[in-house]
């Protein structure tokens, strides 16, 4: 199974390398979101510095929806999902492989965004090791949850409207 997952991940990463969607569309979008947040809160510099980590993760969530949508569309547009099944690759291997590919793409975007946060917001990061560990763990979780959500809504016509907020809207909240 791990070999098949690795094959799916390398396939998705090769497609991404050829199409350059992450660097051509996703990274500029993420940078634009950071700049817009900076304009929105620049009048109150202390608030911007306090909100930097939250703005970083909100931007990552926006970017993750784009990355997951792209990963899912690769399989659904030309019937690649059926080809993978006919090739004998099990669905869990496809899930793991796609999660790895999305996680790698998100890690690249997070590195660029960290540089952007330091440059644009003058953020002072005290514990780089903790930041990288948090990014790694959160990225694995976001990629796995996003890939699962993408697989669940792959056949739905209005799949673009299904997002993380829809899943969270039905959570029970203790008051």
Residue ranges and their predicted role:
Residues 132-151:
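Hydrophobic alpha-helical transmembrane segments of polytopic membrane proteins
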Residues 91-118:
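Selective transmembrane-helix segments that form parts of the transport pathway or gating/packing helices
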Residues 165-166, 170-175:
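Conserved small/polar residues in nucleotide/adenosyl-binding loops
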Residues 1-26:
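Aromatic- and glycine-rich beta-strand/loop motifs that create alpha-glucan
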Residues 52-68:
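Long, hydrophobic alpha-helical segments
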Residues 16, 65-85, 99:
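Transmembrane helix boundary and interhelical loop/hinge segments in multi-pass membrane proteins
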Residues 40-51, 115-134:
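Membrane-interfacial helix-loop-helix connectors in multipass membrane proteins
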Residues 83-91, 170:
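Short helix-to-coil transition segments within interhelical loops
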